[in-house]
């Protein structure tokens, strides 16, 4: 089960579109959303760096205001959807300084093709090879000050909100992977015959399938409950993290058990 296509859609919807919908100005929404909701274009979310990711405050990419322009310098890595022919741009997390000299995360839109901005695909991945993953380089890249998303210095808040929704998307991917592996294993257990009967009639295989089904339903309930909290406007950050972790672990466990049921064919 390859999650490349799912990762492409998830990154665009939860990390590309959602911040613009939640925090963009009316002008920004009118400019970008019609194209980005058409199914013909993609948008990236530039957070991760060599020394920053989960520790977002370690961000080293900077933006300095120069009149009515931002001047951006730095490098981002492992950015999904940044180098495709469909990509229009990236929502970039950068460090800026306030009037007191304090550093804060700020969010800025940078369109593909902007001078000083280069996007390069990262090849040789072990997984998700069909999903675009890129390194972004900014060298004195200038964009209008109006490309600011929301308020200056509030990037950490916007980022965390986007990542909470992203965790639900990743959890859904894990659930789908687990469901697919279970269904394949169940079908194989019914059709593969050894010693005159299907292997699913052996208790050891039947017990494996029962455990897989139980874990699958628990993962589904965990994810759906968290989605219900989000849909009803309740806080869900803790539950989103739990759902992402749990469904990911269950996906690995069920996929591993499926390989065991397939035996040599699983390789």
Q: Where are the language model's segments positioned?
A:
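Short glycine/proline-enriched turns and hinge-like loops at secondary-structure junctions
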Residues: 55-57, 82-87, 101-104, 129-131, ...
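A short core secondary-structure module
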Residues: 73-118
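Conserved hydrophobic/aromatic beta-strand scaffold that supports enzyme active sites
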Residues: 44, 60-62, 69, 89-93, ...
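Glycine-rich phosphate/pyrophosphate-binding beta-alpha loops
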Residues: 52, 77-84, 128, 165-169
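Flexible, small-/acidic-enriched active-site or ligand-binding loops
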Residues: 115-144
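A short, Trp-centered hydrophobic/proline-enriched beta-strand micro-motif
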Residues: 39-47
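Internal helix-loop-helix
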Residues: 1-30, 34-40, 80-89, 100-101, ...
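Alpha-helical interface subdomain recognition
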Residues: 1, 8, 23-28, 35, ...
């Amino acid at each position: 089960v390859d999650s490349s296509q799912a990762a492409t859609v998830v990154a665009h919807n939860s990390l590309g579109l959602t911040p613009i919908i939640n925090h963009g100005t009316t002008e920004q929404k009118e400019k970008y959303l019609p194209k980005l909701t058409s199914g013909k274009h993609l948008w990236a979310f530039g957070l991760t760096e060599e020394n920053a990711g989960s520790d977002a405050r370690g961000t080293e990419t900077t933006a300095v205001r120069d009149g009515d322009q931002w001047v951006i310098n730095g490098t981002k890595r492992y950015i999904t959807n940044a180098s495709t022919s469909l990509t229009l741009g990236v929502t970039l997390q950068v460090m800026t300084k306030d009037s007191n000299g304090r550093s804060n995360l700020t969010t800025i839109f940078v369109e593909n093709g902007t001078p000083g901005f280069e996007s390069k695909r990262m090849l040789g991945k072990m997984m998700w090879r069909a999903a675009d993953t890129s390194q972004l380089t900014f060298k004195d890249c200038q964009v209008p000050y109006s490309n600011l998303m929301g308020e200056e210095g509030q990037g950490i808040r916007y980022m965390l909100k986007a990542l909470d929704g992203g965790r639900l998307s990743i959890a859904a991917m894990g659930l789908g992977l687990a469901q697919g592996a279970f269904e394949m294993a169940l079908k194989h257990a019914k059709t593969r015959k050894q010693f005159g009967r299907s292997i699913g009639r052996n208790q050891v295989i039947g017990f494996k399938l029962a455990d897989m089904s139980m874990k699958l339903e628990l993962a589904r309930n965990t994810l759906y409950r968290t989605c219900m909290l989000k849909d009803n406007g309740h806080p869900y950050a803790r539950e989103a993290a739990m759902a992402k972790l749990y469904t990911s672990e269950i996906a690995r466990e069920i996929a591993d058990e499926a390989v065991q049921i397939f035996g040599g064919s699983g390789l």
